[in-house]
């Protein structure tokens, strides 16, 4: 494929920033996969609200995005999507690292994490073996198939993908 630069020559600090940006994904309405920035904003606001309520237990603070109040069921749904996404990232990273190790491929956790984020968020090249100077061809077939599932999950939105996998969706 085409590559504009080799991430291996970049500093670890820059790669850490890129890894964090991979989590950020796109804005609402964009065609990017992964978690949208609005969900991260709500998640951070929930943490702030909960910390405030720990200090002031009797306080009631509604969630606001701009000038609009966000209802609690919506906040709860966003938190479920964030948690599900993070579980997929952790599980995907573990699966990719273990499966690569099983066949003798030396894949670091950061490479497995970037590979997971790349396919789940439809982002672009990852780091190291799954980076611009590498590719996915060296990965074992089960890993490639799993990454295909992660790619579909990220593109369709995580919850939509999981709903389609439930038996009750197909039976009635």
PLM feature spans:
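Membrane-proximal intracellular helices of multi-pass ion channels
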Residues: 1-172
